[in-house]
């Protein structure tokens, strides 16, 4: 823990940290639950956490009610392990679900679960367009 805190101590401005369970290629290679990580997450000196949920599922959102209120969340709403491009409606429903569980004040960002490095560029571009369309649909734009 100390090394992580030390690594973040020199950063000015907003500090974000991405965490996922490493399901490379869609295969879950690490087991665990977000609730088990709450003591660790509550000790981190970060402004917001960037988390995967689209692939993993949203069943554990309740665990984040135990997160320090000043730590905001980035919620993954686009599955980067699948070539299928989500519809705007699917993404809007994922956002709505997260907001219903955690409240709008906790969610700072919606984003893909992780990076798109495994996907063809054309798929990644369409997924990003779907993310924008889903966010806009959720916001009623």
Describe the role of every protein-language-model region.
Residues 3-141:
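Domain-level signal for soluble alpha/beta catalytic cores
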């Amino acid at each position: 823990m100390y090394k992580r805190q030390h690594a973040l101590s020199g950063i000015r401005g907003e500090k974000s940290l991405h965490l996922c369970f490493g399901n490379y290629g869609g295969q879950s290679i690490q087991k665990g639950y977000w609730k088990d990580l709450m003591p660790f997450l509550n000790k981190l000196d970060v402004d917001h956490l960037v988390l995967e949920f689209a692939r993993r599922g949203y069943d554990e959102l309740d665990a984040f009610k135990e997160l320090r209120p000043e730590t905001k969340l980035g919620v993954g709403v686009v599955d980067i392990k699948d070539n299928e491009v989500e519809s705007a409606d699917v993404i809007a429903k994922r956002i709505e679900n997260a907001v219903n569980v955690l409240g709008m004040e906790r969610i700072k960002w919606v984003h893909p679960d992780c990076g798109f490095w495994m996907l063809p560029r054309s798929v990644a571009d369409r997924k990003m367009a779907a993310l924008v369309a889903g966010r806009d649909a959720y916001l009623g734009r």
